[in-house]
């Protein structure tokens, strides 16, 4: 803060013999300063983990079987005495 100078207007006399007193003017000048400081930090961490399993299915093989055809038909054999004696 500072103060200004002062001055005087001096004395003077009018024609009616009225004396004026001196007048002093002062002025004040003011200066102001201000500082503002702010700091901030922000930290964030994140992790994401995912696991998954899938079991495979099983498939049984088909069974294949076939018949080998029909057996030959039965037939009668007649044995004669001549064949048996040989």
Swiss-Prot record:
Transmembrane segments: none
Locations listed in the record: Nucleus; Cytoplasm, Perinuclear region
Entry keywords, A to Z: Biological rhythms, Cytoplasm, Nucleus, Phosphoprotein, Repeat
Region described as Disordered: 1-86
The UniProt record lists the keyword Nucleus: yes
Keyword Oxidoreductase listed: no
Coiled-coil spans in chain: none
Protein name: Period circadian protein
Organism: Drosophila robusta (Fruit fly)
């Amino acid at each position: 803060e500072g103060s200004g100078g002062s001055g005087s207007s001096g004395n003077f006399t009018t024609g009616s013999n009225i004396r004026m007193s001196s007048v002093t003017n002062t002025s004040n000048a003011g200066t102001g300063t201000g500082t503002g400081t702010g700091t901030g930090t922000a930290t964030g961490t994140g992790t994401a983990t995912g696991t998954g399993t899938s079991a495979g299915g099983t498939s049984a093989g088909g069974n294949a079987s076939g018949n080998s055809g029909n057996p030959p038909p039965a037939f009668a054999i007649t044995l004669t005495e001549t064949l048996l004696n040989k």
